[in-house]
């Protein structure tokens, strides 16, 4: 195995660490959709989940291994496991369909974790790590070990742990900055120290994993690459626990745009034009939008690379410069991440074949049933909007691939409000037993009345903690996308919907979020003793 490749391995953990963002819970079908997108994007490794955490996670990892990772040229499919036999065996079982399975096992090494969380001594850790790495190695050839909270661990102890993990068969050793505490110079020095002080480090690839609590994750990773790290663990849009993880799109485009700077650190001539990663950068924007839509986590407008303002220029001086030559104020082409500027693409006279063709050009793969349903939505929208743009089509398709089971289905919504009238909403909802129930409510505003009317029918307790509206397209007939977040027993459930009528979009988003909560409650009844990770 080449443990010092002249390229950077991209390890995506959107489906594992990214899903730990509050409100980002995904069902199995949604995870499969994202996994397929990650494969198209060209990531080397997909961390599909934590198989022993719950039956749902096990099922997701197994299905991703079978449908996305079963071919010789598929990405490596990885499952997370603590350093216990039960965890590792669950990961091995879930990964069995994968052509290239990897078990990723971890144990904390910082004194604060040993004392307060694990209640273990350093000597116990030195004994557990090689034993469990060897156990994982008995199932798969590819084993990754992570010393959790490595950034706050004693370096000399860390070197000993890594040496034993590699001797036991670890092919990748991952260095996590678990709480986002280190600075770039410190993190670079940590990686350099590992290169210089772990005797058998040439037998493993050095990986890094980091959180963005101080906004330094990407900078830390780039410094790590300069000092010998060759695998970067990251997520789409930087989603993850607390302030999130290192952002895949920012890392990849930094290596892409500043290739001549990073080339020498990977043993290449500075002028080499060979890509530093296997990522198809033209898939970045579409993958970002997909993850945002399925998780319900909106990308802030000023987000680097994929934010709505990333290629926008307000200043007259900047606009003038860009019109004369893009490079005056843009360091990369928007098309390099797959962001096109197509406007009018279809209208109400467009047929099904034209609709299908445009979706294929945009990279969407729909089944016949999904295509038929999406085309019906397109025709309905075309009756209300004169011009249909790619963003409109994207909203239609994202609604169609929103795979939350339709236990409660919105059949009718009607709202009455005004400056001298009490907002009143009437809804009709088809319930899981097939009956249609109608009810009405008044509220402080139209959305409040709407949610109260829906609650009177659905009767699922919850707390609405976030309601937001943003425009999908421009103009007076623009689509409005509503994102709603509910909380129940400490967990958050998100959903979104788009429509030219934001009241209708609000109703659809609220019902969709309630459906997610309903599914979670059903699963909880079936598996009452879920493992908390």
UniProtKB/Swiss-Prot annotation:
**UniProt xrefs under Pfam families:** HCS_D2 (PF22617), HMGL-like (PF00682), LeuA_dimer (PF08502)
Q: Please list where the region (Regulatory domain) is annotated.
A: 409-533
Give the pathway: Amino-acid biosynthesis; L-leucine biosynthesis; L-leucine from 3-methyl-2-oxobutanoate: step 1/4
Q: What is its main location?
A: cytoplasm
Could you confirm whether the keyword Manganese appears in this record? Answer: yes
The residues the record assigns to binding Mn(2+) are 17, 209, 211, 245
Source superkingdom? Bacteria
Which cofactor names does the annotation list?
A: Mn(2+)
Q: Name any Gene Ontology BP term.
A: L-leucine biosynthetic process
Enzyme type, top EC level: transferase
GO CC terms:
cytoplasm
What keyword terms does UniProt attach to this protein? Amino-acid biosynthesis, Branched-chain amino acid biosynthesis, Cytoplasm, Leucine biosynthesis, Manganese, Metal-binding, Transferase
Report the InterPro entries cross-referenced here.
Answer: 2-IPM_HCS-like, 2-isopropylmalate_synth_dimer, AIPM/Hcit_synth_CS, Aldolase_TIM, LeuA/HCS_post-cat, LeuA_allosteric_dom_sf, LeuA_bact_synth, PYR_CT
Q: What is its EC number?
A: 2.3.3.13
Q: Could you confirm whether the keyword Transferase appears in this record?
A: yes
Q: What is the catalytic activity of this protein?
A: 3-methyl-2-oxobutanoate + acetyl-CoA + H2O = (2S)-2-isopropylmalate + CoA + H(+)
The residue ranges of the Pyruvate carboxyltransferase domain are 8-270
What SUPFAM superfamilies does the annotation carry?
Answer: 2-isopropylmalate synthase LeuA, allosteric (dimerisation) domain, Aldolase
Q: In the record, what terms sit under GO molecular function? A: 2-isopropylmalate synthase activity; acetyl-CoA C-acetyltransferase activity; manganese ion binding
Q: Which family does it belong to?
A: Belongs to the alpha-IPM synthase/homocitrate synthase family. LeuA type 1 subfamily.
Stored HAMAP family = LeuA_type1
Question: Could you tell me what this protein does?
Answer: Catalyzes the condensation of the acetyl group of acetyl-CoA with 3-methyl-2-oxobutanoate (2-ketoisovalerate) to form 3-carboxy-3-hydroxy-4-methylpentanoate (2-isopropylmalate).
What is said about its interaction partners and assembly?
A: Homodimer.
Please give the name of this protein.
2-isopropylmalate synthase
